[in-house]
Amino acid sequence: MDTPRPIKRALLSVSDKAGIVEFAQRLSEKGVDLLSTGGTAKLLAENGIKVTEVSDYTGHPEIMDGRVKTLHPKVHGGILARRGIDEVVMDENGISAIDMVVVNLYPFANAVSDENCSLENAIENIDIGGPTMVRAAAKNHKDVTIVVNASDYERVLTELDNNNDSLTYKTRFDLAIAAYEHTASYDGMIANYFGKMLPAYGETESKASLENKVKFPRTFNSQFIKTQDLRYGENSHQDAAFYKEENPEEASVSTATQLQGKALSYNNIADTDAALECVKEFDEPACVIVKHANPCGVAIGDDILAAYEGAYKTDPTSAFGGIIAFNRELDADTAEAIVSRQFVEVIIAPSVSDAAAQIVAAKPNLRLLECGQWDNKTTGFDFKRVNGGLLVQDTDQGRVTSDDLTVVTKRQPTDEEMRDLQFCWKVAKFVKSNAIVYVKNSSTIGVGAGQMSRVYSAKVAGIKAADENLEVKGSVMASDAFFPFRDGLDAAAEAGITAVIQPGGSMRDDEVIAAADEHNIAMVFTGMRHFRH
């Protein structure tokens, strides 16, 4: 099984033609006979590369508008033939061995991503012959090489150059795994696409008429690609790795470029994601500092230095060893303020100035990430693994504007309070429930996270503010869910809160509103909850 296999005949049929001409030219120079189909054969011939059309090889033309091209015993017999076993059968049927298959599949994902794609067009972009050849070659990897990724062309050529025009079993096996991953992803995309259309079955072929398709398909297929093994997971006794989606969202922790620092840990990645997604909520220059997936300081300012100063003063103790995210370029002044003041695990920003990078370089272990700019169009699903199952939901993209707010108390919030309330609400969305956030002048002054009762989260927020000598009087408060009792309002009033934002919807809303009126607190309802677990 470990015997290297020479490459004497290759079949090339690709939708993505990047690099295929150069690859085929090198194979041809090595004396490899090339078989090809349709557009690939035409492209190779136009570039002066000797190639035999599969239809000429099989003696059977492409039929049904190209639906049937390679589905022929001379093709699949040549791929599946077991060397040393099937030669007699091959000779009897005029079948030649095919040693390498180079195939990538019809661009189904690209086709259906077009909102004008009809069901008929989607169907025509389902590859049949391609996956069949890929699976056949992967199955027979003992004798046949399968290449599905253009990124592997150079690797294959290099090994052929260094190994007497042969490929090792190790390489063939590795490429076979890549082939199965490729077809699994492809079939998963098709299953997801059609699985969402179940309610509309038989109605029409127009995608526009399928707007009532289900959001969650009958089976959920998603492929993630391992980008790195991690030293350990949340704890040192847990093994871990980091995987990213096939087409990850831009400006995310999965696509960020690490400019310097130690390798990211499991907790670094999780906390950096929490910080980055929170800072994306703000249009103004903003800074978010996260510890254990909770914001411990958030602020906006005229620039990111002012925002950092505001976020840091919320809770300098918790900020130690935290993650810092910005929604503007990291500049030299802000970088200097950070490295001269605190120990930080990760800094992430859309971009990093050269001067800032030089300053951070003085702390070589500090992980500095550049994520690029975003367009505030985060979509997709959140996943939560449970024993034996998977919970899937939309990402929480719920946002409110001043038009969505209902003032339910006798006193109206002032303009300044209203600005702080809306800021406070954005922060509360990213704090673990039960979440209470105190804000003053567009900066958090106390965060109460993860308490089992809402009133204790309110007390924790007040304690945190007091510990840092921050003045609560005149600040506002956000609660991620309704107050089941008036005690949360009483605690807020005792701390000096003057305005509150919350979803409303409690059976005791009247009691809570009465408590707010008693304390002359202005209160607004959002009608939207932001539980986070």
Swiss-Prot record:
Alphabetized PANTHER family for the sequence: BIFUNCTIONAL PURINE BIOSYNTHESIS PROTEIN ATIC, BIFUNCTIONAL PURINE BIOSYNTHESIS PROTEIN PURH
Name of the protein: Bifunctional purine biosynthesis protein PurH
Annotated source species: Colwellia psychrerythraea (strain 34H / ATCC BAA-681) (Vibrio psychroerythus)
Q: What are the recorded GO MF terms, alphabetically?
A: IMP cyclohydrolase activity; phosphoribosylaminoimidazolecarboxamide formyltransferase activity
Q: Which GO terms describe its cellular component?
A: cytosol
Q: Which superkingdom is the protein from? A: Bacteria
| Catalysed reactions, semicolon-separated | (6R)-10-formyltetrahydrofolate + 5-amino-1-(5-phospho-beta-D-ribosyl)imidazole-4-carboxamide = 5-formamido-1-(5-phospho-D-ribosyl)imidazole-4-carboxamide + (6S)-5,6,7,8-tetrahydrofolate; IMP + H2O = 5-formamido-1-(5-phospho-D-ribosyl)imidazole-4-carboxamide
Enzyme nomenclature, EC number: 2.1.2.3, 3.5.4.10
Q: Identify the pathway.
A: Purine metabolism; IMP biosynthesis via de novo pathway; 5-formamido-1-(5-phospho-D-ribosyl)imidazole-4-carboxamide from 5-amino-1-(5-phospho-D-ribosyl)imidazole-4-carboxamide (10-formyl THF route): step 1/1; Purine metabolism; IMP biosynthesis via de novo pathway; IMP from 5-formamido-1-(5-phospho-D-ribosyl)imidazole-4-carboxamide: step 1/1
What's one GO BP annotation on this UniProt entry?
A: 'de novo' IMP biosynthetic process
